[in-house]
């Protein structure tokens, strides 16, 4: 009985850890939960942070680093990168679902009461990990396009 209970607990714990790191929807939700103030920290900085390396693709992080070299000359992106909004106060709640095999559609309620829908374009690494490769906002350029243009 003790072995069976231990096995069930181990499966639950390891399953939760596996889901948070490898399933795209859970990764987006976990990252959104960290964006509670609407600013860049703790997720974003002028150089890729540990959280960026965990949740975003290497190519995204390279584009971010190249673009941010110009951030002192002009503001590369002066909004919350996860929402594309200025002064939203961060993400209060999020619902997300797979829209396509590599796309997570997220609807977010911000702390200012507004709602925002964005899509996270995901890539699957050879090691089996999922990473965000772009954030697509309605009615404006995607984050990756902004970064690529600024990094030239």
Locate predicted features.
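Short, linear, compositionally biased motifs with a strong N-terminal bias
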Residues: 10-11
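Core segments of small alpha/beta cavity-forming domains
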Residues: 20-72
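N-terminal signal peptide c-region/cleavage motif recognized by signal peptidases
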Residues: 14-17
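Positively charged n-region of N-terminal signal peptides that target proteins for export
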Residues: 1-4
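Surface-exposed, charged secondary-structure patches
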Residues: 56-114
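Low-complexity, intrinsically disordered terminal/linker segments enriched in charged
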Residues: 70, 97-103, 107, 112-117, ...
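Short beta-strand edge segments in extracellular beta-sheet folds
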Residues: 121-123
């Amino acid at each position: 009985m003790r072995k069976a209970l231990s096995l069930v607990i181990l499966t639950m714990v390891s399953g939760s850890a596996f889901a948070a790191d490898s399933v795209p929807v859970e990764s987006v939700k976990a990252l959104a939960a960290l964006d509670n103030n609407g600013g860049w920290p703790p997720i974003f900085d002028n150089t890729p942070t540990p959280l960026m390396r965990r949740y975003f693709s290497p190519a995204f992080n390279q584009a971010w680093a190249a673009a941010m070299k110009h951030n002192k000359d002009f503001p590369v992106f002066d909004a919350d990168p996860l929402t594309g909004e200025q002064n939203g106060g961060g993400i209060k709640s999020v619902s997300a679902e797979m829209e396509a095999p590599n796309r997570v559609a997220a609807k977010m309620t911000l702390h200012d009461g507004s709602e925002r829908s964005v899509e996270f374009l995901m890539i699957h690494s050879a090691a089996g990990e999922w990473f965000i490769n772009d954030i697509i906002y309605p009615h404006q350029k995607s984050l990756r396009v902004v970064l690529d243009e600024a990094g030239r």
